[in-house]
Amino acid sequence: MKAMIFAAGLGSRLKPLTDTRPKALITVGGKTMLEHIILKLKAAGFDEIVINVHHFSNQILAFLEANQNFGIDIQISDETDCLLDTGGGLERAYYLLHHPEDMFTKEGETPYELIFENLMKGMDEEEIIERGLGIMRKECYLLHNVDILSNCDFESLMYYHQNSSNINATLLVSPRKTSRYLLFNDDNLLRGWVNKDTMETKPAGLRYKEGEYREYAYSGIQVTTPKILNLLPRGKYSIIDFYLSI
């Protein structure tokens, strides 16, 4: 399984701690936040991790080297030239996360070839299409902000996403109090965002009305898919803003 840790941010809300180090290396309970997340991912069965870096990137690279990458395959997405936020950062990491060969069956077929071949044999149409789509759904990635520590069961989150039909991204949210909420409809589909301090809303033109949506705080953890990666434009933007634009 594959994951990406967003560790490039400036950590402005953690100043003055981040004046001399990246937020990924802030220590909590005797371990850096980055170490907590890497070890939790490793324990959950993840064997490939991409980490994006920008602020004090040399410190993160040295930390990983000193710890032999904690015995896991870790690749670095370098944003030292320009901080890209979560959406742009994910797009830059595209080729580190997405390997087309992972979309093949054990027999070397793509999901599309499998669907076509078995339909030609006269097999049940719904069953074959579901098998092909199942292969595509299994190729997904867990995305995790580096400044989030949680008791989330990563295996259960991945299982939920992989066994949910027609879902391109699964966001981990909570009912905690905040000024900024994600807005969902009754089917738990993302429909908007609101800052209750300023009453700014997204997407443009959204009219917010109290009680019209289910309101949750984003927890900084999600699962996404190759389909989303293929749609991402280059540039600097939030992944949540991107979801609200499509």
Description of each model-found segment:
Residues 27, 183, 223-225:
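Short, well-ordered beta-strand micro-motif
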